[in-house]
Amino acid sequence: MTDYSTLMHSPGSESRHQCLIYNGAPSQKLSLLARALQTKLVEGYRCLYLNSPPMVAGMRSTLASMDSDIAELVKDSLILSSDTVSSGKNFDSGVMLGKLEDLLDKAIKDGYKGLWASGDMTWEFGPSKDFSKLMEYELGLEEIFHRRKELCGICQYHHDTLPRDAMRQSLLIHPTVVINETLKIINPHYLKFKWPTDINTNQKLDKMLAELCKQ
């Protein structure tokens, strides 16, 4: 059973560790993510966007349509990547978390306020689609958010491509849920239940997931 005690007694990650839960075409969320990314660039953060090649191309186009100088941004401030840690192998949460913290350290060393990162969970876990380490990864990520105030970002959970348990877990480990470009809500299920959850809890989580997917 997953133990949240360390996280519950450490300083909160406030709204820096956010979750975007949705269904339908991922391209429909490009504008939302591009606005969030652009805001963080203006605030002085280096930004990382991790997704499939078509989605990375879509992000480039979306940012360009917002009058962002993509060529100049990609040189330093913005990292658009389709690289996966798994590369066909089993997902290694330790390697992924280590790379993320290395990028954060480098951003600070280069004079940025910190690192904003957004990754699609389906893409991050690679073609094997083995999500058995998802909770371990998210708990490790949340621990970094507690420890490193310079880190912020949005985890993307696509209902159409992730198993139900993965979607349920998304509601247990993110303090804030992104609704649209202007609205975010406090997640009422954050660190409230231990995993695996019982039938009654699953029903509560599934109800909220269904409501979020209507947005």
Residues of each region from the PLM?
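Non-catalytic regulatory/interaction regions at protein termini and inter-domain linkers
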Residues: 1-215
